Amino acid sequence: MPVRRRWYPPSSTAAQPSPDGGDVNTDDADACPSSRQQRPPSLPQHSAPIHHRRRVINSIDASGEVMEYGSSNDQRMQDMEIWPSDGGGVEEYDPWTAWLYKPHTVSVLLAGACLLIWASGVLHPEITSSHDKVIPIKRGVWAMIAVFLAYCTLQAPSTILIRPHPAVWRLVHGMAVVYLVALTFLLFQKRDDARQFMKHLHPGLGVELPERSYGSDCRMYVPENPTNRFINIQETLFDEFVIAHVLGWWGKAVMIRNQLLLWVLSVGFELMELTFRHMLPNFNECWWDSIILDIMICNWFGIWAGMHTVRYFDGKTYEWVGLSRQPSIMGKVKRSLCQFTPAKWDKDQWHPFMEPRRFIQVFCLCVGFMTVELNTFFLKFCLWIPPRNPLVVYRLILWWLIAIPAIREYNTYLQDRSS
């Protein structure tokens, strides 16, 4: 459906539609002052935001409304709308949510200081007094991390992502630094000490895991089993890694948004499993488990679902107007929920075969991706972390959040250098 916008008579310097009905590009950044001056007196001067983007005008109907067509990216509005201010300048955000984008350093400082005083227990020393010296140390370490994350949320460098809020991605940046510091600390510990240290993060850790090999019996049909002759297939299908494969590749497809690159990573990781099966028992899989179940079923379904999600939202037409301009309560609710979705769903163009340098750059991305995935299994094996431990899920979610701005910025960097 086309987007309908009210049309006002253009100024003498504005571009006119061609007589043959062709497309004419007009620049809103240049047409903003003239369009504001020529608004009818019955309409308020500040009733609509000024969007800094280019419009493609196809036709003007009899009612005086512009019919806009074009790609979904041209239709998409950014969250940072340019609103006229009463002082003659411009404001970058919707008036209802502008306070969220203003600095609140002093307010957070005062609130954080009060929270730290309350959490430290200095107001009630008789309650917090304990002979156990480990508990205060744990609370102190968590308080240090909280203070650092609060600082990163306020002062860390912003990414190119604006949804749901730039502060969210600054917080993710701080969590990535905390994770890096924790890995650095474990690097300087002995292996047994590092395993026992994990008990401070989860009480169920620090215990040696039983070795499990998926390739000990690769028969698809087991005739000597009276209860279930397809017991090997059943145990593999109901393993937790099946769901992990599907959800993981769906998330990777939403991040990378390039089918060729996703299939390279899918096949490449299976080759990595084949390479390191002598080191990790979990990598010792049967041929039908690795080729059929992993690549052709789980990975394919995750990639298909992720790319279908990207195509679905990329093909829809949006009008990202501010929250205050939504006409109904449901519209305001939907606009608030859309704030937690990406601002752009267009597919990334990597062009790995454009030139040798671009091929090396994309190859480095694949190597980094597979290294992060291999680290998951090596850390579980070295630190005795079972697959169903919540720390594994927390780490994967953290890495997914870290990879979202990292891949987007890396793709933007490659596109800017090529242009």
UniProtKB/Swiss-Prot annotation:
It comes from Oryza sativa subsp. japonica (Rice). Its EC number is 2.7.8.8. It comes from the Eukaryota. The keyword Lipid metabolism applies. The gene is PSS3. Residues 1-51 are annotated as: Disordered. GO terms for molecular function: CDP-diacylglycerol-serine O-phosphatidyltransferase activity; L-serine-phosphatidylethanolamine phosphatidyltransferase activity. This is CDP-diacylglycerol--serine O-phosphatidyltransferase 3. It catalyses: a CDP-1,2-diacyl-sn-glycerol + L-serine = a 1,2-diacyl-sn-glycero-3-phospho-L-serine + CMP + H(+).
